[in-house]
Amino acid sequence: MSIRSSLVVGFTGVALAAALAPAQAQTCQFLAPVGGNGTTNVITKTIGAGNPFGRPNWNTDFFVTQPYGSFKFFFTADSSVSATYPIQGYLKFTDGSSLQVINESFAPQMGTGRMWGPFPAIPGKTVSQLNFKIGASADQAATGFTYRISTMGCN
């Protein structure tokens, strides 16, 4: 066997061993909602109409109290009628900036949902909160629909 053949066989064996090695399990923790009651990290809301005299309930923030390598967002539809939910998700940073990681309309069946992510942490930035925005003044069709949301930080 030539040196070149030996190297190819050796590299192939290393690559195969790496592919078959068990993956490091990711450890994730639910993040607490800002303004929550401390008993649950899963928030249930109904999309309300915006109004000029009060704040709509479109935004929900979740505290990030330690460094994580990535983040996940979870959404479940609770309405008995199929609806299209305008969904946005943001990583909010300690320097006041933010990064939009979700921007789509989602039409799940009742009781079903979706996970977005994992979204990696941004080098040189510290995440202070995750923000979920469900519904918007530009799309009033989702008004009245109920949903559950939660977020996780993972290492």
Which positions does each model-derived feature cover?
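Short, surface-exposed beta-strand/strand-loop-strand elements in extracellular ectodomains
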Residues: 83-101
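Bacterial N-terminal signal peptides
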Residues: 9-19
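Bacterial N-terminal signal peptides that target proteins for export
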Residues: 1-10
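Solvent-exposed serine/threonine-rich low-complexity stretches and specific carbohydrate-binding patches
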Residues: 99-110
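Exposed aromatic-hydrophobic patches
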Residues: 112-121
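Noncatalytic modules at the cell exterior or secretory-pathway interfaces
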Residues: 73, 120-145
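Short, surface-exposed binding/anchoring microloops in extracellular/periplasmic proteins
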Residues: 45-87
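Sec/Tat signal peptide C-region and signal peptidase I cleavage site
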Residues: 19-27
